[in-house]
């Protein structure tokens, strides 16, 4: 079965890393993947190519809307002859549907929505427009995949309605993300930490939705309670972001490490004593599951399906409540290493049993087979969408 994955970019982020994990986990003797990006950038391009998977790009600039790129997408998809086009995130979802009328009727299209949506006005202007246009297109795709129950409910309320709307959560590589004493020792040595330090980390790119500011406010409050606490921010932009840099000169001076983007995330997490997710909007946070798989106590904000993932194996605090977050950080620190390890062991077991990448990949595989069976067996006609390219597709190709 040929599957084309269409995604905005392959910079390191939650959706992009989930795609990489899915590509690793799916049976290559059964599924033949190709990846197409809207924007030609990102550290994960070479990671995917090293897996022997072709990566192509429409070479769009960020924020650009281009009929030329749509014609190029149609050309690529026709040449690839996919059985299923799996798109990832709003922009790629809309692009897949815009190309759909020029593909064979047997080709299925599945959207993947990767975030919750609490307030559309907080999104960039172009993203707002793309989300709104998605309401018109969503009923006509073959499947609407959300990575959280909350996301599905929120998008349904604004008009994302589809007969096959389902939740497939993020999956986690428990063999890669695991407790690793050697990695813990080497990473903490790199940071110059002694054995008594309690290292609390956020692993997330800088974006308003990740709310690093709330984490830093909580860190300042918790640091005043416990002198052993040391804090860490890892992820794209954390080493240059103004609020993060400012914190280096404030109450967290000498107790905050800003690492920027890291490719050795399992090693970073192995060195932590607890992980925090301070996000304001998420679907099913990758960092939460990865931290739990590493055997860490995790504190997450009550957004998306974070509460469902953590369950009894961590702590959940109200979104944006720095005082509550600080209190939980201080409380976990006070428990001591042995008790934190017990909580972390329970967290890892929960991920292993309920959120392994193997089980998630199996669900995607079944979905693709269902789509193909329906398209080839029912004779269902593709919805008639308004032509988008500036000239007829055949002339463009």
Region locations from a protein language model:
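A conserved mid-protein helix/loop that constitutes part of the nucleotide-sugar donor-binding site
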Residues: 13-24, 198, 202-221, 231, ...
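A short, active-site helix/loop in glycosyltransferases that binds the activated sugar's phosphate group
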Residues: 139-167, 172-176
């Amino acid at each position: 079965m040929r599957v084309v994955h269409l995604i905005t970019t392959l910079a390191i982020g939650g959706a992009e890393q989930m795609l990489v994990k899915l590509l690793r986990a799916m049976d290559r003797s059964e599924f033949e993947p190709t990846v197409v990006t809207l924007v030609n950038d990102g550290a994960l391009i070479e990671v995917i190519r090293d897996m022997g998977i072709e990566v192509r790009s429409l070479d769009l600039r960020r924020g650009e809307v281009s009929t030329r790129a749509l014609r190029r997408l149609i050309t690529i998809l026709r040449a690839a002859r996919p059985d299923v086009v799996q798109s990832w995130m709003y922009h790629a979802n809309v692009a897949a549907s815009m190309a759909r009328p020029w593909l064979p009727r047997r080709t299925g299209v599945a959207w993947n929505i990767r975030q919750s949506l609490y307030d559309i006005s907080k999104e960039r202007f172009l993203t707002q427009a793309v989300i709104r246009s998605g309401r018109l297109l969503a009923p006509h795709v073959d499947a609407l995949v959300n990575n959280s129950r909350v996301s599905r409910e929120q998008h349904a309320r604004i008009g994302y309605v589809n007969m096959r709307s389902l939740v497939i959560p993020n999956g986690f590589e428990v063999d890669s993300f695991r407790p690793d004493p050697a990695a813990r020792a080497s990473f903490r040595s790199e940071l110059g930490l002694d054995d008594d330090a309690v290292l609390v980390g956020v692993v997330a790119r800088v974006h308003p939705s990740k709310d690093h500011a709330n984490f830093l406010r909580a860190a300042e409050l918790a640091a005043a309670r416990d002198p052993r606490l040391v804090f860490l921010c890892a992820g794209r932009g954390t080493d240059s972001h103004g609020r993060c840099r400012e914190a280096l000169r404030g109450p967290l001076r000498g107790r905050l490490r800003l690492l920027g983007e890291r490719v050795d995330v399992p090693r970073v997490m192995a060195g932590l004593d607890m992980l925090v997710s301070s996000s304001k909007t998420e679907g099913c946070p990758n960092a939460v599951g990865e931290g739990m798989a590493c055997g860490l106590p995790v504190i997450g904000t009550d957004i998306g399906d974070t509460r469902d993932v953590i369950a009894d194996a961590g702590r959940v605090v109200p979104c944006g409540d720095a005082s509550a977050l600080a209190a939980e950080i201080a409380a976990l620190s006070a428990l001591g290493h042995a008790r934190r390890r017990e909580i972390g062991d329970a967290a890892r077991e929960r991920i292993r049993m309920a959120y392994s990448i193997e089980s998630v990949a199996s669900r995607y595989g079944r979905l693709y087979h269902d789509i193909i069976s329906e398209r080839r067996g029912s004779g269902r006609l593709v919805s008639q969408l308004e032509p988008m390219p500036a000239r007829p597709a055949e002339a463009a190709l």
